[in-house]
Amino acid sequence: MEINYEKVGLKVGLEIHQQLNTKRKLFCHCPTILRDDEPDGEIVRVLRPSLSEMGEVDRAALIEARKGKKFIYQFYNDTTCLVELDEEPPHPPSEEALRIALEVALLMNMNVVDVAYTMRKIVIDGSNTSGFQRTIFLARDGYIETSEGKVGITSLCLEEDAARKIEDRGDAVVYNLDRLGIPLVEISTAPDIKTPKMAKEAARRIGEILRATGKVKRGLGTIRQDINISIKDGARIEVKGVQDLDLIEKVVENEVIRQLNLLKIRDELRERNAEVVEKIFDVTEIFKDCKSKIIQNALKKKNGKVKAVLLKGFAGLVGKEIQPGRRLGTEFSDRAKVIAGVGGLFHTDELPKYGITEEEVKKLKEFVNAEENDAVIIVADEESKVDRALEAVIERAKEALIGVPEETRRALEDGNTAYLRPLPGAARMYPETDIPPIIIKKEFIEEIRANLPELPEEKFERFKKEYKLNDELAKKMVLSYYVDLFEDLCKKFKNVKPVLIATTLEGTLKEIKREGYDIDKLEDRHLEETFKALSEGKIAKEGIVEVLKGFCEFPDKSIDEILEIKGLKGLSKEEVEKIIEGIIKEHLNVVKEKGEKAYGFLMGRCMAKLRGKADGKLVNDILRKKLKEI
Amino acid sequence: MNVGDVIRVETDKGIFEGILLPSTNENIITIKMKNGYNVGILKENVKNIEIIAKGEKPKYELPPLNIEKNEKLKTISILSTGGTVASKVDYKTGAVHPSFTADDLIRAVPELLDIANIKGRAVMNILSENMKPEYWRKIAEEIKKEIEEGADGIVIAHGTDTMSYTASALSFMVKADVPIILVGAQRSSDRPSSDAALNLISAVLAAREPIKGVYVVMHGESGDTFCYLHKGVKVRKCHSSRRDAFKSINSIPVAKINPFTKEIIYLQEVEKSDNSKKVEINTNLEEKVALIKVYPGMDGEIIRFYVDKEYKGIVLEGTGLGHAPEYIFEHIKYATDKGVVVVMTTQTINGRVNMNVYSNGRELQKLGVIGCEDMPPEVALVKLMYLLGNYEPEEVKKLINKNLVGEIEYRSRFDAY
C-alpha cells in the first residue's frame, strides 16, 4: 500500500537532544562521565508537587495530591557533588557549553536572543533531584536544507540532562546522579517535514551539524530524538526515544499507518452505532475452573478477580491490525499495563484460546449480555488493579469512537510505537533566580561566527585533497560516526596511509560485526592502540583484523596482551629474514629447479608463516633479494 | 505599558510576542514567550513596541478549606517572621508569593490536619539576615500573646541564617510551659524538593509534645528521612546550603523526629511541661555587646573603639582553649578597667574554653576575662546581652559561666562531636 503523504496531510516535527562533550557539567564543575562501578552512597528524597496546581478543597483529595514520591539517588564522592544532590545552589553555566550551543545555532541560521534566562521546568518523576530541570532558551527562527525543502528550526535550548534511572525498587525509584547535569542542546524543528524520508534526512542533517562542532558526545544514549507526528483528522503524537536514523523513517511510516487504521476503525464503529458500556462485570465465577495459566495465577492472588467490560459493536475490530503486529486490542492492553500495572488482557476477538474454552466464552457473553456484534474485554489480577485496568480500557475504547487520541508514545525496535503517557500540557516553567540573566553580546556572536567549524561538504573536499580518499570513501568518512577518530588517527600516525585507516573504520569494523563480533565493546583507545602498533611495526596491516577481533573479545586487555593471545607477537626485520632464509633452504631443490620462477611458490609459503606478523611488501622485498643472491 | 501586558516587540532579530515581566536591568525588556521561556531584549535593539492586550491582575487566592477544629488535637500557633514555609508560584511571571494563613499552610502541608489544629499568622516580614534584638523582643511578645490565647505549642518560621541567634534570645527571654519550636528551610518552598514540608511537620509534632523550652527543628541528614530536635542554645548553622546544616554543638540532639510515622525518639532528657500554660517574658536586652574574632596580627584598637562607644560587653572568639595574642592585652585591660565585661569563647566552636591550662589563659584571667565554658560564640553574645540587660556587671561576671537555660553542659560527651 503506497501512502500519499501529502494527501493524508502528514506533518512531522523533530525534537533532538544531544549531549555535549564538555569538560564540566552545565551547572557544576563535575566531570561529564558515566560510571558503572558501585556508588559511594545513596540518599532518599521525597518530591512533592508544587502548590500552584491545586484547587482541591476536599481533605482526602488534598492529602493525596500533596503526597510526595520517594526516590533514591546514588552518588560518587569524586565525580558528583552537592549541586547534583540539590544541596548547593547551581554554579554559573559552563561557558564552553554555551559557546558550543551558539555555534550550533549559527550553523543552523538561527537568531540568537540578546538576553537568555535560565528557567526551571517542573519535573517530579524523580529524574532531577530539585524537582525541576534547568533550561536556557538561546535561539530561534533558523532553518536547515534537505533535498525535499527547508525545515525551520524553531528553537534551540541549552539544558541539563536528567539523572539515569537504575531500577524500580517497588516503594522507591533509584537514580544514579552521574548523568544529571551533563549539558544538552535541545533542537526543535517546525512541523515542516512532509515525508518519512524527509524526516530521516532532516535528522541526519542536524546530526551532521552537531558533529561538525567536534564537541558532542558519541555513543548510545548521547543523542535522543523525539518525533511529533500528525495527519489530517488524526492527532499529534509525540514518539519518544528514537535512537537510530533508519528507525525515524520507519516510525513515521508506521505511525501514519496506525492513525489511518484508527480512523477507519472509528468510521466502522460509527456505522455500527457502537457504544462503550461503562460498567465493570465481575465474572470470576465463570473462570474459576479455567485452564488458562494466566487466569489461574491471578485467582491465586489475594483478592484475585476476573472482570469484564462490554464494548457494543466492537466485534472483529478489537483484533484488527493497526500497525504491523499490533492491534486495537494491543492499544487497550498498553493503557491497562501502564495505568494499572497488570500483565495484559484478553478480548473475545482472540478467544477461545490460551486455555480459555468456547464454553467459557459463551458463558461470559451471556453474563454481560453481549450480542453478535459486541466484544468483551477481560482482565485477571488483584481486584484493585483489575478495576483500574478496565477503567483505562473503557476510556481508551471511548477514544476509539472519536479517532486518534493525543498521546506520548515510546518507540519500539521494529518501528512500531506503544503508549507511554498522555501528551504533556504546557510545561510549567518559572525563572531560576539563582542564576543571573546571560547577556549575549554581539561581539561574542561575531567572534563565534568567524570561527565556525567546518561543515560536511567542506570536509568532504578536504578529505579528498588532504587524505587522498576517493569520492566514495571520503563521503562515507565524512558521514561516519568515526569521523573525528579518523582525523585523530591520521594526525597521530603519519606513516599509516589514511586510506587504510578509513577502510578499517568504515569497512573492517562492519565485516567483523557481520561475523558476530560485538564492536560496541570497541573504544577509541582500542583503535588508537591498534594503529600505534601498526605504525611502530609491531603488527602488519594484515594483523589489524585479528587485533580488533581480539579487543572485541577482551576489551580490557592491552595491545601487547592481545598480540600474545592472537599469536601476532611482532617480528623484527632480522627475524623475518631468518624465517625466509629457512623457507628457502627447506625448498632449495625447487629453487634450483625453477630458478626465479620459484618466487610465486615461495611467497605463498612465506606468507603462510608470516601473515599478520609482517608486512607483505617487506616479505616480498626480502624474498626477491634472497633469490637474487643465490 | 505595565507588567503583565501582552506585547509585541519588533527588533532587528525579528518579532517577539509575550507577557511583559519585571526586569532587574533597566536596559532589558523581559518577556515570557508562549513556549514558557523567558527572553530578554536589549532596548537598544528595539524598533517598535505595541501592546496587544492588557494584562489581568493576578489573583493568588484559592477557595477556603473550611477546616473544622478537632477537639482531640492540640492547638499549635505557627508564627512567621518572614521565612516562607509555604509559597505559591505564578508560572506566568515566575514570582514566588509567600503565603501564611492556616489555610495556606494546610494546603501546602495537609499532613498537619492529622497532627494539630493550626493557627497561622505572620508577625513580621524580616529577612533573617536583617534580624536584630528589637525583633527578638517582638517575637517574644507575640509568643506570650498566643499562649495566653490558648496555644498548646508555638512554631516560629524563621530564616536559617540567624535562626540560632533568635533561638538563643528566646531561650533566655521566654519562660513558658509549652514548647517553642523554630523551623526553617534550606531549599525554597516553591520547589518540589524543598525540605520545608518535612521540617514543618516535624516542628508541629514537636510543638504538641508535653515539654517546655525553646528548640530548633531542621533536617537530620541530607535525605528526606528524619529531622532533629535541637536545644535552642546548643545549635548552630554549620553549612551554607546543605539540608542538614544545623548541628547540636557540644551536645547531642534532644530527639529524632520521623515526619512520616510521626514517631519521636528522645535522645536525652527534656524538661516536662506541667500543663499550667504559664508564660512570662523578660525582654530586657543590652544591645551594646560586641563579638570580636581573634586572629594573628589583629589590631587591638578595635576593643578601645567599642569601649569608647560605651559598649557594656565584649565577647572574644579566641583561639584554641580561649587564647588571645599578648599584644592586645593592654587593650583588654583598658576595657576591663572601664568596667566592660569581657568574656572568652573559642573559634573552634566545639570544645570547652579552659584558661587554666596555659599561661596565656592565666594572664587573661588576671586581666578579668571570664571563660564561657562550652557555649558557642553566638550563644555567649546573646546571653551577655540578656545578663547585662538585667543585672549589674559584677553579678553578670558571676552568671556568664553558670548554666541558666541549658546553654552550658558541664559534662563533655564523646559522641557530641
UniProtKB/Swiss-Prot annotation, chain A:
Keywords, A to Z? ATP-binding, Ligase, Nucleotide-binding, Protein biosynthesis
The family database entries (SUPFAM superfamilies) matched by this protein are listed as: GAD domain-like, GatB/YqeY motif, Glutamine synthetase/guanido kinase
Q: One cellular component GO annotation, for this chain's record?
A: cytoplasm
Is ATP-binding given among the entry's keywords?
yes
Task: Name the domain of life this protein comes from.
Answer: Archaea
The terms under GO molecular function for this entry are: aminoacyl-tRNA ligase activity; ATP binding; glutaminyl-tRNA synthase (glutamine-hydrolyzing) activity
SMART domains, sorted: GatB_Yqey
User: Its GO biological process terms?
Assistant: glutaminyl-tRNAGln biosynthesis via transamidation; translation
Q: Does the keyword Calcium apply?
A: no
Annotated EC: 6.3.5.-
Gene3D superfamilies, alphabetically?
1.10.10.410, GAD-like domain, GatB domain, N-terminal subdomain
Q: What does this protein do?
A: Allows the formation of correctly charged Gln-tRNA(Gln) through the transamidation of misacylated Glu-tRNA(Gln) in organisms which lack glutaminyl-tRNA synthetase. The reaction takes place in the presence of glutamine and ATP through an activated gamma-phospho-Glu-tRNA(Gln). The GatDE system is specific for glutamate and does not act on aspartate.
PANTHER family according to UniProt: GLUTAMYL-TRNA GLN AMIDOTRANSFERASE SUBUNIT B MITOCHONDRIAL AND PROKARYOTIC PET112-RELATED, GLUTAMYL-TRNA(GLN) AMIDOTRANSFERASE SUBUNIT E
Belongs to which family?
Belongs to the GatB/GatE family. GatE subfamily.
Report the protein name in the record. Answer: Glutamyl-tRNA(Gln) amidotransferase subunit E
Which organism is this entry from? Methanocaldococcus jannaschii (strain ATCC 43067 / DSM 2661 / JAL-1 / JCM 10045 / NBRC 100440)
Q: What is the lineage of its organism?
A: Archaea, Methanobacteriati, Methanobacteriota, Methanomada group, Methanococci
From Swiss-Prot, chain B:
Keyword Ligase assigned: yes
InterPro entries referenced in this protein's UniProt entry, alphabetically: AsnA_fam, Asp/glu_Ase-like_sf, Asparaginase/glutaminase-like, Asparaginase/glutaminase_AS1, Asparaginase/glutaminase_AS2, Asparaginase_C, GatD, GatD_N
- SUPFAM superfamilies according to UniProt: GatD N-terminal domain-like (SSF141300), Glutaminase/Asparaginase (SSF53774)
Q: Which UniProt keywords apply?
A: ATP-binding, Ligase, Nucleotide-binding, Protein biosynthesis
Residues in Asparaginase/glutaminase domain copies: 74-403
Enumerate the GO terms in the molecular function aspect.
Answer: asparaginase activity; ATP binding; glutaminyl-tRNA synthase (glutamine-hydrolyzing) activity
Q: What is annotated as the active site?
A: T84, T160, D161, K237
Annotated TM spans: none
For this protein, the Enzyme Commission number is 6.3.5.-
Can you supply a Gene Ontology BP term from the record? regulation of translational fidelity
Q: Which reaction does it catalyse?
A: L-glutamyl-tRNA(Gln) + L-glutamine + ATP + H2O = L-glutaminyl-tRNA(Gln) + L-glutamate + ADP + phosphate + H(+)
Instruction: Please report which protein family the annotation says this sequence is part of.
Output: Belongs to the asparaginase 1 family. GatD subfamily.
- Which PANTHER family is this protein grouped with? 60 KDA LYSOPHOSPHOLIPASE, L-ASPARAGINASE
Instruction: Kindly state the subunit structure of this protein.
Output: Heterodimer of GatD and GatE.
According to its UniProt entry, the function of this protein is described as:
Allows the formation of correctly charged Gln-tRNA(Gln) through the transamidation of misacylated Glu-tRNA(Gln) in organisms which lack glutaminyl-tRNA synthetase. The reaction takes place in the presence of glutamine and ATP through an activated gamma-phospho-Glu-tRNA(Gln). The GatDE system is specific for glutamate and does not act on aspartate.
What is the official name of this protein in its record? Answer: Glutamyl-tRNA(Gln) amidotransferase subunit D
To which species is this protein native?
Methanocaldococcus jannaschii (strain ATCC 43067 / DSM 2661 / JAL-1 / JCM 10045 / NBRC 100440)
